[in-house]
Amino acid sequence: MSARKGYLLPSPNYPTTMSCSESPAANSFLVDSLISSGRGEAGVGGGSAGGGGGGYYAHGGVYLPPASDLPYGLQSCGLFPALGSKRNEAPSPGGGGGGGSGGLGPGTHGYAPAPLDLWLDAPRSCRMEPPDGPPPPQPQPQQQQQQPPPPPPQPPQPQPQATSCSFAQNIKEESSYCLYDAADKCPKGSAAADLAPFPRGPPPDGCALGASSGVPVPGYFRLSQAYGTAKGFGSGGGGTQQLASPFPAQPPGRGFDPPPALASGSTEAAGKERVLDSTPPPTLVCTGGGGSQGDEEAHASSSAAEELSPAPSENSKASPEKDSLGSSKGENAANWLTAKSGRKKRCPYTKHQTLELEKEFLFNMYLTRERRLEISRSVHLTDRQVKIWFQNRRMKLKKMNRENRIRELTANFNFS
C-alpha cells in the first residue's frame, strides 16, 4: 500500500495530500482487493460474519457500501487510503474486540464521513495549497449503522487560503463609477477626483459636453464647461436660430461675420442679409461717423461713394413699398433705412447733408455761430438743426471712445 501511495500522484480535482487514482481500472482493483481483505480480517478479528452486500464491520460500527454505489472520488480516496495509513497503528479500542490482527478494518476512528468535507469537487479556477499533514480522524457515532450511503457532496465554502478568483472589487468600482455618472449633476469633489483616471465611454444624457475626451474631468469643471458651451452655441446664436429668425442673430462683436458653415446652411435671404451686414453699416453715415478722425474720413469717403452711385430718391426712402424691392438697389436702401432690430430708422438728414456735416466735424468739433450759419445755408438746414446735429455727434463720439477703450482692455485677457 505504501508503494502504491508513492506511485500515485495528487489529483488536480481534490486539494488534499491523499493520493488518488484517476483510472477506473486502478480504482476497481483497489476497491475489490481491499474489500475482500478487509472483510476477511474483520471477520477473524471481530468474530462476526462480515459478509453480505453492504459489508458491515461489527467491531467499528462502520458500514461499507459496495463499490458500485460509491460515487467517483469515494472509491479510492474517501475510505481506503485510511486503511493503509492505520496499518502500523495500535489496535483501535472497538466495542467488539477491535480489529487487532492488523488494523485493516476501520475502528472507532472511522474515516467514512471524511469525503463530505475534504474530497469535494472544488472549482478549477481556485486551487488550495495541500496541507502539511493528514487531516485528523473524526469519531463515528454508533447510530450510523443503519444509515444509507452518504449524500452527494455539497459545494464547499470558500477557504481563506484560496486565491481570489472573482472580480468583486472591480465590479464594485464599476458600480460606483456608474453611480458617479448617474449623479453627474451633483458630483462630489472627492469622488470625482478618485474616479478621474478610469477610462470613460460616451457621456450620458445628462452631460451636455459637445466632444468629450477619453478621460473624464472632475465634475465641477465639467459642469461649468458644459454650461458655457450650452449657453454659447446651443441656445445663444446657433444655426437653427439663424434659420428660424428672419434676421440673423447678431454676435457680440461689431465687425464679426457669421462662419461659412452657418452661412452655407442658411436660406438665400439669410445669405443676402449676411452679405449686406458684412458691408460697413451706413448708420454711422446717417447719424455720425467713427470714433477717430481716420474712421470719420473713411465713413465720409464711403458716403461720397454712395452718393455718386445711383442712390434712390427721397420718395423711395420714405415709402416702405419701394424699400422691399427684390433688386440690389432696393435691398441696399432697405438695409440703410432698417435697423438691426427691424424697425425703421429715424433719419432726418439726406446723404449729402450728412456728408457735409461730417466733413465740418472732422475739422472742428465745436462751431462758432458764424460758421454754423454758413453751414446751415450751404446744406439747406436751419441754424438750430445744425447745432443739434453737432451736439449729438459729440455725444456719439464720446460713447464710441468709451466702447473702444473697454474693448482694448478686454482684448488683453485671453479667456480661452
UniProtKB/Swiss-Prot annotation:
GO cellular component: cytoplasm; nucleoplasm; nucleus; transcription regulator complex
Subcellular location: Nucleus
Biased composition (Pro residues): 131-140, 147-159
DNA-binding stretch(es), residue numbering of this chain: 342-401
Region of interest called Disordered, as start-end residue ranges on this chain: 40-60, 81-167, 228-345
Keyword field contains Nucleotidyltransferase: no
Function: Sequence-specific transcription factor which is part of a developmental regulatory system that provides cells with specific positional identities on the anterior-posterior axis. Binds to the DNA sequence 5'-AA[AT]TTTTATTAC-3'.
UniProt name for this protein: Homeobox protein Hox-A10
Natural source organism: Mus musculus (Mouse)
Gene name in the database record: Hoxa10
